[in-house]
UniProtKB/Swiss-Prot annotation:
Region (Disordered), start-end ranges: 47-68, 473-497, 873-911
Source species: Debaryomyces hansenii (strain ATCC 36239 / CBS 767 / BCRC 21394 / JCM 1990 / NBRC 0083 / IGC 2968)
Compositional bias ranges of the Low complexity kind: 55-68
PROSITE patterns: DOT1 (PS51569)
Residues that, per the record, bind S-adenosyl-L-methionine: 981-984, 1004-1013, 1031, 1068-1069
Main location: nucleus
GO CC annotations, alphabetized: nucleus
EC code(s) of this entry: 2.1.1.360
Upper lineage: Eukaryota, Fungi, Dikarya, Ascomycota, Saccharomycotina
Domain of life: Eukaryota
Protein name: Histone-lysine N-methyltransferase, H3 lysine-79 specific
Protein's GO biological process: DNA damage checkpoint signaling; DNA repair; methylation
Length: 1172
């Protein structure tokens, strides 16, 4: 083994002072200095002349500090006397070069033989106070470690004169740990000088050119292998950063540029490019290089995808995703690329773990493995996913384990008593003990106090002890010992045991409960009947959401009036049987009635004075408010043509394209059903007559999702499209399929039938209310009839001439109905004649009134009745397959098992399919008028307002399908910073944008748009000319893109116009010219500055400088601080006139339930006078 460490240099110490006793401290003093004051003065004079410099080991930065005087026998002693000379320019430049390359003692003394080491160190600190480690210093340190890793670094301190002990020890331990990782690794091809050279280049230069120059006998692959074993970091040094910027500026291909940095992975290079992208002078270059970088990664990903066995990867995604199996199956392939390929194949890192992963995780937890090793062995899982799975596998991992029930009881008693009475309180002393446990390796670094040097006279005087004082001390010690003996004789109190504590607490519990008597030994507790308190008022039944405020108050009044009837009061007071005659009310009864009436009047006044719901937060279409259109077109352009028609859409049987950036739409939208299936633990079964959420798989005997529990709802404009739901009841605030179905009914009314109050009543009473009643009464047959009515109504009323076939879209779930329970909705059931007549009428002929009865009015056309056969194979029935009615003969019906509807069968799929009779039935149906389509589109053209409830529900439908399931990730940001995610609810956006009078000709922008809710709402509800937003968070930006794609497809299905959106995602608005240009042109600006700090507020003010007068800025905090005065800085704050407002609704933001204040700042033409 070669020895590459510098040999110890022997220095001759020439004492200047003639007195050997005074030179024992190894201080260099002029001749004749003998006293301590003379030494101090002489040291100070030498420091003033620049000859004496304290040892660099001292932590003091002041060279004149007396406290920095330490033993300099090794560092300041030289083989020649101290010379009084100045530094020439050549020597200074040479020393500057040494500061960059080599600061070892051997290099400094050889370069400046006529200078003392103390003078050299002082000059170095004058030239550069903060010193970086040089390459040769690290080379020397690495050589010391490689030769003798157990050597103490203090023995080699003299070789590093510019480093103090703590800094040197820290560096020594860092490289020692790095070299220690080579133990057990075959590195016989490497010599010690080569390893030391590689270590010296870590923080200096690891480019390809430098590596080939320093290590000519090694290729790049060998160097990569050794650096991987040593776990050398891949951060850019200063030299590498400069070279990276230069090479990126050139026109060389990206592959050649990356080849110059062989030890830097692509992620590190990409992060460096992103930092360059933040600089305005490099933005164009960085953007171009980032595009090249992405294409390079995609090409590599494609090559890897073509080279590996995808079938094998699919198998491993289901069975084994441990790192060991993946590395053996795909040797040499990066786990990052494998994970990207797996995600393209539908892999979800938060999904179910494979059996091999679970076995490994359990084994690792049993062996108490570290979390880092578990993460390394599960490369396809994130740290958050692994921690969540660990908590679910071993939820009681940190709980105390008791050997018996008595130990557990005593443990509980101990903590219970300490919390309530303080008898056995114990405080954890580890934090105090940790201060006393000093590491052994640092004990040698503690500086020993210097010995006190006293004169002979001072020593003699110190030895003399006053006799009187000694006698007094002896007397006091004797008294103290006597008191200690008395205290020792006293008997200590008997400590309270845990059992006694339990008895005391049990006695206290008995004294406050039951008959409040403490039980004695052998006594039993008396049983007393529990006191029952009867409520004075009746509990109100839950009302369906389709009742408006007026109807609810009227129903409450009726119920309360019934409660004060004399018969009911008499019935409550009477204790006789029902056969006795009714008695007249006496004076006492009448007084009771009057008291009840008074209490009821108070309740009525309270209900009438109850705060009304905010008009900006409608609950349903009965409490809806309207937003004026101001002449803008709400629907697609085809609606406003001379011959209106729904635009043609391309449908495809692919459930994934709903969240893809393409023009095609899935024939069946399964997003809502997928959410329920992926989070089925958050749902429970519907009432017993409804299909169960899960069933038992007969093959595996495990619970699986019920494949028959599927319900589909058609759309009006495109009845061939349907939305799929799984019937289940959410346990908390998850997506509710029943509410989604009811809201979809109301959406169709608001968009296509809002001109008719009769149709509103039909939607509310015969669809929404019927669904509520069917669930409350546990009637699945009634529920399915409502769904069938709606699907057939959509088919009959659609203005789109499409062939949707004759198949039953709800065939699976209809298997839970017997043939006698299947009811075919007729024209009368779906009120088809009323719909036709209401659509034929004009707005003047059909004024909206909530009091209109649901009866067919006198139509403006002759309603044609015809006898026709329906539900035959060749008919146009598009709801169900041929089904027999109850009046048909039942001879051909198959036998039905009597216990099919039994509770025991709930959760199982019917084994025998139901055979249906194909006999036809003669019914009377209404025929669609010839001018139906023109009148239908006429109502859409004549719309002058849009439903606020409709707009908000469209946005909430998108939000619940995209954002709600990812809300936890949105909150994984540092608290109380500008990146904290907080949502402005739709009611807030509606109110504030109405307050600023936002109109279609305006432009809107949201600085900090989050997932894009306010930007979407400004475009959809107010129809602005352009709606934009900027967001810096990666996950929120991704959700914005997904919401945009899904929203555009939902708008197309509803016939609404595409929104004009302009987002700047995954980027900051600070020093962003593109965002600033878009903001300057807008008319209304929203800034959620609730958690902006002073610096960010100042940056926003400078960014907004140049807004045109009249622009409105909405913020949650006032931009203008108290006593603000205008300055020379170019900021918009000097031109703002601020008004404070308060929300009318309590629930308007996500972080509080209180009414939130907000500020509207208007830009003025000149600087406001109050700021001058």
């Amino acid at each position: 083994m070669e020895n590459i460490a510098h040999h110890n240099t022997t220095y001759n110490i020439t004492p200047i002072c003639s007195d050997s006793s005074e030179c024992s401290s190894m201080e260099m003093l002029p001749l004749g200095c003998k006293t301590h004051s003379d030494k101090s003065d002489a040291r100070r004079n030498l420091m003033d002349t620049g000859i004496y410099t304290p040892d660099s080991n001292s932590d003091s930065s002041d060279p004149r500090s007396d406290s920095s005087c330490v033993d300099v026998s090794n560092s300041l002693a030289v083989s020649h006397p101290i010379s009084f000379c100045n530094w020439t320019d050549e020597e200074s430049s040479l020393l500057t070069e040494h500061i960059k390359t080599d600061l070892t003692s051997e290099a400094l003394t050889s370069a400046f033989p006529n200078k003392s080491l103390a003078l050299i160190i002082r000059k170095i600190h004058d030239l550069q106070p903060v010193l970086d480690w040089t390459k040769n210093e690290i080379y020397l340190l690495a050589g010391i470690i490689l030769n003798d890793s157990n050597s103490a670094i203090r023995r080699h301190k003299h070789k590093f004169p510019c480093r103090n002990v703590s800094n040197l020890n820290k560096k020594f331990q860092h490289y020692k740990n790095m070299v220690r990782r080579l133990n057990g690794v075959d590195h016989s091809k490497w010599t010690k000088p080569e390893i030391a050279s590689l270590i010296s280049l870590i923080d200096y230069d690891l480019t390809k050119t430098k590596l080939q120059k320093e290590l000519p006998n090694k290729n790049i692959e060998e160097i990569k292998d050794l650096t991987n074993e040593m776990r050398i970091h891949s951060n850019f040094s200063h030299v590498e950063s400069v070279l990276f910027e230069q090479t990126m500026t050139e026109n060389d291909p990206i592959e050649i540029v990356l080849d110059q940095f062989p030890l830097k992975n692509k992620e590190t290079c990409k992060k460096r490019l992103l930092k360059l992208n933040e600089l305005s002078q490099h933005r164009d270059m960085a953007k171009r290089r980032l595009d090249e970088f992405e294409s390079l990664i995609q090409n590599e990903l494609k090559q890897i995808k073509d080279s590996i066995d995808l079938t094998r990867l699919k198998y491993l995604l289901v069975n084994d995703l441990t790192g060991k199996q993946l590395r053996s199956s795909f040797p040499g392939i990066s786990m990052k690329y494998l994970k990207l390929i797996a995600k393209e194949m539908g892999f979800d890192e938060a999904g179910e773990y494979t059996l091999a992963e679970m076995n490994f995780l359990k084994k690792a937890l049993q062996e108490n493995a570290k979390l880092k090793s578990i993460i390394d062995e599960l490369p396809f899982r994130s740290q958050l996913s692994i921690e969540t799975k660990i908590n679910s596998v071993e939820p009681n991992r940190r709980r105390s384990v008791f050997t018996s029930q008595v130990d557990e009881l005593l443990y509980m008693a101990k903590w219970y008593s300490s919390d309530n009475f303080g008898n056995l309180s114990r405080r954890r002393n580890s934090r105090y003990a940790s201060k006393l446990d000093k590491p052994k390796d640092k004990a040698s670094d503690i500086m020993q106090p210097s010995k006190l040097h006293l004169e002979n006279e001072e020593v003699t005087e110190a030895k003399v002890i006053p006799h009187d004082k000694g006698v007094e001390n002896m007397i006091s010690d004797h008294k103290l010992k006597g008191k200690n003996n008395e205290q020792k004789k006293r008997k200590s109190k008997k400590p309270t045991s845990m059992v006694e504590v339990l008895k005391e607490e049990s006695a206290y519990f008995q004294s406050v409960t039951g008959n409040r008597c403490v039980l004695k030994e052998g006594q039993k507790r008396k049983r007393e009947r529990l006191m029952q308190i009867k409520l004075e008022t009746k509990l109100k039944k839950p009302k369906s959401q389709n009742l408006n405020e007026t109807n609810r108050i009227q129903e409450t009044k009726k119920l309360m009036k019934c409660d004060v009837e004399p018969d009911k009061v008499k019935e409550q007071k009477s204790f006789k049987s029902e056969n006795l005659k009714e008695a007249k009310l006496d004076a006492s009864d009448s007084s009771i009635v009057s008291d009840v009436e008074i209490s009821l009047k108070k309740k009525l006044n309270k209900i009438e004075n109850e705060e009304k719901r905010s008009p900006y937060d409608p609950e349903d279409i009965s409490t809806d408010t309207l937003v004026p259109l101001y002449g803008r077109q709400l629907y697609v352009n085809e609606v406003y043509e001379t011959q209106p028609r729904p635009p043609k859409l391309s449908f495809r049987e692919d459930t994934n394209i709903m969240v893809q950036n393409c023009s095609e739409i899935s024939l069946t939208d399964t997003i809502a059903a997928d959410i329920i299936s992926q989070h089925c633990k958050n749902y429970r079964d519907m009432p017993i007559s409804f299909p169960s959420l899960t069933i038992v798989d007969r093959n595996t005997n495990r619970m699986i999702l019920n494949p028959m529990n599927k319900i589909r709802i058609r759309f009006l404009l495109y009845p061939q499209h349907s939305e799929l739901f799984i019937l289940a009841e959410p346990k908390s605030n998850e997506l509710d399929p029943i509410n989604e179905i009811k809201k979809l009914f109301q959406l169709h009314y608001s968009l296509f039938f809002s001109h008719s109050s009769k149709l509103k009543k039909i939607i509310l009473s015969e669809y929404n209310k019927e669904i509520d009643i069917s669930i409350e009464e546990n009637d699945f047959v009634r529920f399915m009839f409502v769904i069938d009515k709606w699907n057939r109504l959509m088919v009959e009323l659609t203005p789109n001439d499409v062939d949707i076939g004759s198949h039953d879209i709800n065939e699976e779930i209809r298997a839970y109905l017997s043939p006698n329970e299947i009811k075919i909705p007729s024209d009368e059931d779906i009120r088809l004649d009323i719909f036709y007549s209401e659509i034929q009428l004009s707005t003047e002929e059909n004024p909206i009134s909530d009091n209109d009865p649901i009866e067919p009015s006198s139509p403006s056309f002759d309603l044609i009745k015809s006898m026709k056969r329906c539900f035959t194979h060749d008919s146009s029935n598009r709801l169900t397959p041929p089904i027999s009615s109850e009046e048909d003969n039942k001879e051909n019906e198959p036998p039905i098992e009597s216990d099919f509807r039994n509770n025991n069968n709930k959760g199982s799929i019917p084994c025998t399919p139901v055979r249906l009779n194909t006999r036809n039935k003669m019914v009377v149906n209404a025929v669609k008028p010839e001018n139906y389509e023109s009148n239908f589109f006429r109502h859409l053209k004549e719309k002058t307002s849009v439903s606020r409830f409709c707009v908000q529900q469209i946005l909430l439908r998108i939000y619940s399908r995209i954002v709600s399931t990812e809300s936890r990730k949105l909150r994984s940001y540092k608290a109380f910073t500008a990146e904290v995610y907080g949502e402005l609810l739709p009611s807030f956006t509606s109110e504030v944008l109405t307050k600023v009078n936002l109109q279609p000709q305006h432009k809107f922008y949201d600085l900090g748009s989050g997932v894009g809710n306010t930007t979407f709402q400004a475009a959809l509800e107010f129809g602005v000319h352009l709606s934009g937003g900027c967001e810096i968070m990666e996950h929120a930006s991704k959700l914005t893109e997904l919401q945009t794609m899904l929203l555009n497809k939902h708008l197309a299905l509803l016939g609404l116009k595409k929104l004009p959106l302009n987002f700047a995602l995954s980027q900051s608005f600070v020093e962003n010219d593109i965002v600033r240009q878009a903001v300057i042109e807008c008319d209304v600006l929203l800034v959620n500055n609730y958690l902006f700090d002073v610096n960010l507020n100042t940056a926003v003010g400078k960014m907004l400088y140049g807004l045109k007068p009249g622009t409105k800025i909405i913020s949650l905090r006032n931009f203008i601080r108290p006593r603000y005065k205008a300055s020379s800085d170019k900021t918009i704050f000097d031109y703002l006139k601020v008004e404070r407002h308060e929300m009318s609704n309590y629930l308007s933001v996500s972080w509080t339930a209180n009414k939130v204040p907000y500020y509207i700042s208007t830009v003025q033409e000149n600087i406001c006078e109050e700021y001058v």
